[in-house]
From Swiss-Prot:
<dbReference type="GO" id="GO:0005576">
    <property type="term" value="C:extracellular region"/>
</dbReference>
<keyword id="KW-0078">Bacteriocin</keyword>
<keyword id="KW-1015">Disulfide bond</keyword>
<keyword id="KW-0964">Secreted</keyword>
<dbReference type="GO" id="GO:0042742">
    <property type="term" value="P:defense response to bacterium"/>
</dbReference>
<dbReference type="InterPro" id="IPR023388">
    <property type="entry name" value="Bacteriocin_IIa_dom_sf"/>
</dbReference>
<dbReference type="InterPro" id="IPR023384">
    <property type="entry name" value="Bacteriocin_IIa_CS"/>
</dbReference>
<dbReference type="Pfam" id="PF01721">
    <property type="entry name" value="Bacteriocin_II"/>
</dbReference>
<feature type="disulfide bond">
    <location>
        <begin position="33"/>
        <end position="38"/>
    </location>
</feature>
<feature type="propeptide">
    <location>
        <begin position="1"/>
        <end position="24"/>
    </location>
</feature>
<dbReference type="GO" id="GO:0031640">
    <property type="term" value="P:killing of cells of another organism"/>
</dbReference>
<comment type="function">
    <text>Active against L.monocytogenes and several lactic acid bacteria.</text>
</comment>
<dbReference type="GO" id="GO:0005186">
    <property type="term" value="F:pheromone activity"/>
</dbReference>
<keyword id="KW-0614">Plasmid</keyword>
<protein>
    <recommendedName>
        <fullName>Bacteriocin leucocin-B</fullName>
    </recommendedName>
</protein>
<keyword id="KW-0044">Antibiotic</keyword>
<keyword id="KW-0929">Antimicrobial</keyword>
Length: 61
């Protein structure tokens, strides 16, 4: 992957710093929610649905 940055460029956060991070929750099926609402990546959601049907309803993949 050419767009990945080296791990040397990142700083590890301690628990106090991690508590200050503001973000949302990703559900793994194309749905991402924050405090202001949820959004859907429809391409990923469709793909997750197809995979779920192919697996007999077992999980997202």
């Amino acid at each position: 992957m050419n767009n990945m940055k080296s791990a040397d460029n990142y700083q590890q956060l301690d628990n106090n710093a991690l508590e200050q991070v503001v973000g949302g929750k990703y559900y793994g099926n194309g749905v991402h929610c924050t405090k202001s609402g949820c959004s859907v990546n429809w391409g990923e959601a469709f793909s997750a649905g197809v995979h779920r049907l192919a697996n007999g309803g077992n999980g997202f993949w």
